[in-house]
Amino acid sequence: MDNITHSIKEGCGNPMCNNAYCKSNPEHSSISENEMGDFVVLTAINEYKECCKFITPKQIYSMTPNDVFQLPIEAYLNDNSLKASFRDFPDNCSSRPKGFEYINHQSIFLFMNFLFNVSNPETIKKVFNSISLVQPEQRVLFLCVPYQTKYHNYYGALFKLITENPINKEVIHQFLCQMSPEHLRQVHFLVHSFLDEMFKQGSVQRSNKYPFMIYALRLFKILYEMNIANEFIDYKSFYVYSINIKREWSDDFDLFFKNKEGLLSYSFIIELYTRVLVVHEENRCEQQLTLSGAIQNNFFELFSPYLELRIDRDNLLLSSLNSLVNKRPIDLKKELKIKFIGEVGVDQGGVSKEWFSLIVKELFKVDFGMFTYNNKTRQFWFCSFADDLQDFKLIGIVLGLAIYNNIILDISFPSILYKKLLDIPLTFDDYNILDPEVYNSLMQLKEMSKVDDVSSLQLTFEAVQNYFDENRSYELIPGGRDIIVTNQNLQLYLDRYADFYCTSSVQKQFDAFKQGFRQVVSSPLLLSMRPEELELVICGTKEYDFDALERNAKYKDYTPNSPQIKYFWEIAKSLTLEQKKKLLIFVTSNDRVPVGGLGNLIFFIDRYGDPEKFPTASTCFNALHLPPYENKEIMKEKLLFAIENAVGFGLA
């Protein structure tokens, strides 16, 4: 009876209480002092239902693990209790909070950690079993549970209960959006650990665990998309390295490649090097289907497994353009074979590498006029005055061909190019990547507007470009040359200024470039990449890890323990960065490091040649022909001379 009286007079403290006579219920029914005595007696006789138990953050912070152990957990796992728990209600709270208002995430994580660390497995089992009894919008609270391997099988059911209702996606997003980066990383760890353990156990596509994987991936995708908007963890942390992709596609090829909600729909969990392998496997399947169709229609004689181009070295661009522009997309994805007209030789990889190198050098010559070069950022951008759009289409095709031929290109674009290729909208701050110097000047305008009136500068809505020592002005908005920039319209000016240089002034050139690129690249696996990932696929990394190169190296007539091989790696690892690049150019014709690092570069060393002569190389096969030198000093002298004089020297 004391509890009933306290509930009526003081309330239970829960603004979400549903007890009709509890004072904490914003909609409670008032009882006068005269009615109080009779009401309490009658209510007690009729088995009065007590207000739900709930836990405040303040209580949790003062708890010890032993306090949690002694709690009647079941009492706190019903829907009404969860709605009220873990909230910092203000003293004057007079209405029911909406959604996750006043929620204290730290207290939830703390409580769940206490619970999992002190409870026995039977109690934890009760916790998981109780989730299905909770309203869908309250189930998200259980995303704060810690990951413990011994409870692995329960987490799949948890993710199912949380994500199976389509409406719940918005609830999940709302709950997660209120978390700190630290707490988001804990949820990320929970889901990532579950997926990692699942793939460690073997192929999941045809197992009864497959549906649970999909529910976990749906949740992981929400986190991934949130991370794109506001990064709380490095994007590589979403890679699940325990996935054995070849095992998955070998186990059920159609399910792997054709399932609308399979692994490839969540490709962000596949590390980049493996994803590129999948792109090539996907292409191999497409080519096989094309071949099968040709055989069925008696066109086999006309079918070639290669993209064969006859190129006039003296008319490189035009002959390349004429050979490529009218090719079907499926043909552009074939293995490239180059034949330079009038030259002897079969392309086993080296001739194609040379063609890529020559055409990139030609197209990116500043005096050729297609691109401008920023000496400070050391990057190229489209020249807005260039009018031969076919050349831009050609370089777009070349980028696509490079991907399908495992060629790393020696080009340097600002990262906004890859954003634009992937149809990711640009912002004003992206201009910082294109031209940091001008961006900083614009930011100074923004700072000035906080203390002064920028109209005093008499700026107008115009941008100026220099064309052969002639300044040309362009209006950023209609009538812009007559509109003064003020504090009120400054943000519009900044946005239009950045858009002019990043987009509108080079729209025709970029559109042609993108058209060429998309003529080759259509795989969702490539088009769903992050800009950083696509740049790595095209341009490679800058990590010159020669330990990784050594681990992957292959030998002929040498072994890893041969004295000459030991000499070579001691020398190679002691080289300066520039010398290491020259060594890679000497052996592979390229100093760029492929996706996944040097450990994924084919690198052969064979015993070949007279010890009195210099090393040579076959760039077609990434092979170094290393004579059996007597000691390290002689080898170093000969090797350094060879790599410093690599152009036209000893290359096969």
Predicted segment positions?
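Intrinsically disordered, low-complexity, charge-biased terminal/linker regions in eukaryotic proteins
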Residues: 137-140, 154-157
